[in-house]
């Protein structure tokens, strides 16, 4: 059977107290609705329809995915009305309904769920709670068959005691939806068209209503305010941390790691507290990451040590490198094996060769540095003239003395030396020495100025 996924994302989210549409608030650095789109994509649906309303243009601009169609719900008249807006875009045999503010539903749960659906079966995802307050209840008959769902505001005292609740997620045939959605009524406490009323229709028409519960209750938790958003963020991060630890990664405090992207981390990696991993991050075996580091779209080679408070953004780091503390690697930086970038060093769009050292207080931009180069403290590559960027080349074995300025474009040759305090504006040949500083003048018996 072909599958269409309908994602309801039209709500304003008044309790978020935000100009941003609710479904665009992020969990792990990604909009909630994008989490749902990505989970749905694991099912390889023929079609995904997102029902939008409040802030629709923002939502459309923020979501990525293949074969996504958009249906507008101009008036917020309930979940049944929302699904009805999607139906003109649905031609597939089966329809799965998901919610843009329920971001942690797992692909494996969805796969098990849709596997229960056929022309004669409607699947309903439920959950049993100790405290079901606020949720619609699942009403069953004496043979344990699902009869209907009753919303809390419409429930009797007996129905309020039921602990099995509706999560809102359901799947059924397109034909059933096309036949049943026009029959929904808004004659209820909310004055809305409830999607949940379809369950009674299905039961009365002889459809088998099959229920399934997720392995983890938080998979179906929704977000209505920032407190709930923060709670799901912590749940997500804890789940990611536990997966890493089971895969052989040491986390010195699992509650103080944030993953905001797609990470691949090998075994025997050690990660200290308050580390943030964003975007696409690959970390090979034996890497040690100190506290308060941020890695964004970075590849880190085996055995590398990253000291505290280091930012690595869009960089490739080789094996057995040493970084930090307080280093900043900006996009386009590539370090060969055994390179060292020390404290208060910034690099950008530069290659640093094998075994080269840039240990202290230095800016390396638009540069190509060979093997075994030593760059002294306070060195600046002057790469920008206010309009254009130029390259600095330091060839193998070059030695740059402290407090030097290298005015690009400039090349320092193989095994060449630049004396400390120099401003270099011309190329230096292989094995040469360049010293470019004013002559020292000493004044004997100098009297300092006095105040007043």
Curated annotation (Swiss-Prot):
Its EC number is 2.7.7.23, 2.3.1.157. GO terms for cellular component: cytoplasm; membrane. Residues 1-226 are annotated as: Pyrophosphorylase. This is Bifunctional protein GlmU. CDD domains: GT2_GlmU_N_bac (cd02540), LbH_GlmU_C (cd03353). It holds the Pfam family Hexapep_2. Keywords: Acyltransferase, Cell shape, Cell wall biogenesis/degradation, Cytoplasm, Magnesium, Metal-binding, Multifunctional enzyme, Nucleotidyltransferase, Peptidoglycan synthesis, Repeat, Transferase. It is an enzyme of class 2 (transferase). Binds 1 Mg(2+) ion per subunit. Acetyl-CoA binds at residues 377, 383-384, 402, 420, 437. It is found in: Cytoplasm. The keyword Nucleotidyltransferase applies. PROSITE patterns: HEXAPEP_TRANSFERASES (PS00101). SUPFAM superfamilies: Nucleotide-diphospho-sugar transferases (SSF53448), Trimeric LpxA-like enzymes (SSF51161). The keyword Repeat applies. Mg(2+) binds at residues 101, 224.
């Amino acid at each position: 059977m072909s599958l269409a996924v309908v994602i309801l994302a039209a709500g304003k989210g008044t309790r978020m107290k935000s100009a941003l549409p609710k479904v665009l608030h992020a969990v792990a650095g990604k909009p909630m609705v994008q989490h749902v789109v990505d989970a749905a994509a694991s099912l390889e649906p023929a079609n995904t329809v997102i029902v939008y309303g409040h802030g629709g243009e923002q939502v459309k601009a923020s979501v990525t995915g293949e074969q996504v169609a958009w249906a507008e719900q101009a008036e917020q008249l309930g979940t049944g009305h929302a699904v009805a807006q999607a139906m003109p875009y649905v031609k597939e045999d089966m329809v799965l309904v998901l919610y843009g503010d329920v971001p942690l539903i797992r692909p494996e749960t969805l796969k098990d769920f849709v596997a229960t659906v056929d022309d004669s079966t409607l699947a309903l995802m439920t959950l049993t709670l100790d405290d079901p307050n606020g949720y619609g209840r699942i009403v069953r008959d004496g043979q344990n068959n699902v009869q209907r769902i009753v919303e809390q505001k419409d429930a009797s005292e007996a129905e309020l005691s039921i602990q099995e609740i509706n999560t809102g997620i359901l799947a059924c045939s397109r034909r059933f939806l096309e036949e049943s959605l026009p029959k929904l009524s808004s004659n209820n406490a909310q004055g809305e068209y409830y999607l949940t009323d379809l369950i009674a229709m299905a039961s009365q028409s002889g459809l088998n209503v099959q229920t399934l519960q997720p392995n983890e209750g938080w998979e179906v938790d929704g977000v209505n305010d920032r407190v709930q958003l923060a709670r799901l963020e912590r749940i997500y991060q804890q789940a990611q941390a536990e997966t890493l630890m089971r895969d052989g990664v040491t986390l010195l405090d699992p509650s103080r790691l944030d993953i905001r992207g797609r990470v691949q981390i090998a075994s025997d990696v050690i990660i200290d507290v308050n580390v943030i991993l964003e975007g696409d991050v690959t970390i090979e075996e034996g890497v040690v990451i100190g506290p308060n580091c941020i890695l964004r779209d970075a590849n880190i080679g085996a055995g590398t040590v990253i000291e505290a408070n280091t930012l690595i953004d869009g960089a490739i780091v080789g094996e057995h490198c040493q970084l930090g503390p307080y280093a900043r690697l900006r996009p386009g930086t590539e370090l060969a094996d055994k390179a060292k970038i020390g404290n208060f060093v910034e690099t950008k769009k530069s290659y640093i060769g094998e075994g080269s050292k840039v240990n202290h207080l230095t800016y390396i931009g638009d540069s190509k540095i060979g093997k075994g180069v030593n760059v002294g403290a306070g060195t600046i590559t002057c790469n920008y003239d206010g309009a254009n960027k130029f390259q600095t080349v330091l060839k193998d074995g070059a030695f740059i003395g402290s407090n030097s300025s290298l005015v690009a474009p400039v090349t320092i040759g193989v095994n060449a030396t630049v004396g400390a305090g120099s401003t270099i504006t011309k190329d230096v040949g292989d094995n040469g020495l360049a010293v470019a500083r004013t002559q020292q003048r000493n004044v004997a018996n100098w009297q300092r100025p006095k105040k007043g």
